[in-house]
């Protein structure tokens, strides 16, 4: 009976807490909405754009005690919180008062808050960043922040100096970003050390009677890295089992053909049987490292890696992967892999770190230990929450500097925050499907990258002009002689 009463009391407390929190958030939304409607009614419109005059409203000091007691307040003064507006509707949140340590900000995708005097930052998702609609004119107190963890092929113009330097804050795959996402596909040290999927070497040797030494699983064919051209050439010198749509010569079980199954336990079991995995990225960029690299390491398979030129900085140990860049031709790579395939002692030097659970790379350990977000970890913020809070805390930090009569700190991205060279084409003397090799790269990726330079310059000029512009105006600049 006592236990039941305790549960009933606990449930009541939880309900009260939830109700109070909803009232707090609702009040913020209502207050902001009232202000915005009044602003729309009273403002003057000139040339189709709002005429915003006067100094932005200063943020009132937000002491830690008040921040920590936020959830217990029944009414929130909307004027006390900076607004952080997602210009890309990534989160889908129409309004949320988010707590970031001792600070709090109002996060929203509602573009009607663009000209609110408490709006301090605009957040952009790289893949969705386009010229069709930008928050212009840009006020002096408006920071721009970029979140881009995906492939550069999704939006090449971001990788050029005129565009990347438009942003004050960044969260990208580069270690030089303000919030590095380099290890975004790695849950932690434990999964690297885990032997859950490891197939003993003797069993792998027995499986070699029906399996190739190498496995390749890709369904995004002919990307900017031109990986399929390399693998096609490699196949002329060594057996490769290819399960994906690209260069396919072997079928996965029917239940594993859906791309969603790539993280399924059954798929891991199939791939873990191989000695080597061709881990080729779709683009060659510093620190752009995806699950293609981390997956074989988790499974106890040796990755044969092509992608980030800086990959050596992220290896668990010096001998944990075979780097394609160290071989002048696929023929040499094939010869080396065959040598490891026949020599158990030499092969085991590449999995020794896994068997002993010893990661010697301090850079990797430090990055995992110090990152402010987690991967599939309910006890940590995800990287989007961390990105939002980084911007929120910086907004408040500058507010406190201004309260002290000091100039605000100026943050600015540079080219190291997103660095990708021009796509390069593999050229081989042997005629391995010459009609197909590099076709899409020649016809699409190189011209796309080259045009993106012109797009970046045109966009920068228009943004610096600080007026809204049409797509016709933008493209006229891009193709101007």
Swiss-Prot record:
GO terms for biological process: cerebral cortex radially oriented cell migration; N-glycan fucosylation; neuroblast migration; neuronal stem cell division; neuronal stem cell population maintenance; oligosaccharide biosynthetic process; positive regulation of protein secretion. Widely expressed, with a higher expression in liver and thymus. Pfam families: Glyco_tran_10_N, Glyco_transf_10. It is an enzyme of class 2 (transferase). Its EC number is 2.4.1.221, 2.4.1.-. Its main location: endoplasmic reticulum. Disulfide bonds join 389-392. It catalyses: L-threonyl-[protein] + GDP-beta-L-fucose = 3-O-(alpha-L-fucosyl)-L-threonyl-[protein] + GDP + H(+); L-seryl-[protein] + GDP-beta-L-fucose = 3-O-(alpha-L-fucosyl)-L-seryl-[protein] + GDP + H(+). Residues 1-8 are cytoplasmic. It is found in: Endoplasmic reticulum membrane. The keyword Heme does not apply. It is a single-pass type II membrane protein. Glycans are attached at residues 110, 168, 318, 468. SUPFAM superfamilies: UDP-Glycosyltransferase/glycogen phosphorylase (SSF53756). Keywords: Disulfide bond, Endoplasmic reticulum, Glycoprotein, Glycosyltransferase, Membrane, Signal-anchor, Transferase, Transmembrane, Transmembrane helix. Pathway: Protein modification; protein glycosylation. GO terms for molecular function: alpha-(1->3)-fucosyltransferase activity; peptide-O-fucosyltransferase activity. The chain crosses the membrane at residues 9-31. Residues 32-481 are lumenal. One of its GO terms (cellular component) is Golgi membrane. Protein O-fucosyltransferase that specifically catalyzes O-fucosylation of serine or threonine residues in EMI domains of target proteins, such as MMRN1, MMRN2 and EMID1. Attaches fucose through an O-glycosidic linkage. O-fucosylation of EMI domain-containing proteins may be required for facilitating protein folding and secretion. May also show alpha-(1,3)-fucosyltransferase activity toward the innermost N-acetyl glucosamine (GlcNAc) residue in biantennary N-glycan acceptors. However, this was tested with a library of synthetic substrates and this activity is unsure in vivo. Belongs to the glycosyltransferase 10 family. This is GDP-fucose protein O-fucosyltransferase 3. It comes from Mus musculus (Mouse). The lineage of its organism: Eukaryota, Metazoa, Chordata, Craniata, Vertebrata.
């Amino acid at each position: 009976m006592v236990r039941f009463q305790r549960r009933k009391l606990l449930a009541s407390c939880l309900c009260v807490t939830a109700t109070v929190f909803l009232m707090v958030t609702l009040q913020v939304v209502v207050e902001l909405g009232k202000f915005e409607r009044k602003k729309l009614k009273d403002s003057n419109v000139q040339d189709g754009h709002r005429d915003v005059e006067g100094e932005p409203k200063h943020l009132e000091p937000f002491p830690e005690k008040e921040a920590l007691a936020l959830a217990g307040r029944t009414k929130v003064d909307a004027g006390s919180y900076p607004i952080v507006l997602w210009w890309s509707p990534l989160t889908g949140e129409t309004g949320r008062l988010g707590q970031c340590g001792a600070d709090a900000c109002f996060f929203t995708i509602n573009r009607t808050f663009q000209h609110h005097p408490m709006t301090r930052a605009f957040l952009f998702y790289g893949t969705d960043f386009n010229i069709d609609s930008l928050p212009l004119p840009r006020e002096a107190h408006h920071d721009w922040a970029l979140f881009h963890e995906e492939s550069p092929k999704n939006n090449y113009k971001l990788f050029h100096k005129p565009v990347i330097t438009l942003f004050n804050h960044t969260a990208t795959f580069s270690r030089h970003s303000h919030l590095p996402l380099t290890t975004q596909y790695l849950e932690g040290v434990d999964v690297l050390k885990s032997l859950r999927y490891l197939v003993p070497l003797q069993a792998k040797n027995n499986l070699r009677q029906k399996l190739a030494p190498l496995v390749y699983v890709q369904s995004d064919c002919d990307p900017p890295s031109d990986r399929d051209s390399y693998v096609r050439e490699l196949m002329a010198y060594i057996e490769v089992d290819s399960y994906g749509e690209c260069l396919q010569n072997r079928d996965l079980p029917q239940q594993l053909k859906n791309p969603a199954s790539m993280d399924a336990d059954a798929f891991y079991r199939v791939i873990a049987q191989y000695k080597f995995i061709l881990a080729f990225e779709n683009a060659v960029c510093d620190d752009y490292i995806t699950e293609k690299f981390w997956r074989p390491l988790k499974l106890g398979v040796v990755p044969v890696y092509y992608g980030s030129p800086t990959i050596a900085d992220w290896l668990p140990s010096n001998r944990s992967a075979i780097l394609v860049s160290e071989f002048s031709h696929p023929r040499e790579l094939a010869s080396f892999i065959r040598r490891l395939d026949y020599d158990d002692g030499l092969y085991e030097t590449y999995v020794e770190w896994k068997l002993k659970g010893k990661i010697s790379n301090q850079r990797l350990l430090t990055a995992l230990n110090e990152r402010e977000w987690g991967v599939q970890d309910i006890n940590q913020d995800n990287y989007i929450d961390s990105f939002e809070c980084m911007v929120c805390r910086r907004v408040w930090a500058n507010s406190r500097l201004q309260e002290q009569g000091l100039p605000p700190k100026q943050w600015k991205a540079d080219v190291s925050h997103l660095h990708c060279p021009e796509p390069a084409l593999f050229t081989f003397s042997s005629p391995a499907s010459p009609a197909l090799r590099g076709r899409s790269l020649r016809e699409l990726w190189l011209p796309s990258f080259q045009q993106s330079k012109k797009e970046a310059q045109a966009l920068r000029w228009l943004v610096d002009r600080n007026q809204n512009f049409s797509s016709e105006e933008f493209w006229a600049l891009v193709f101007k002689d």
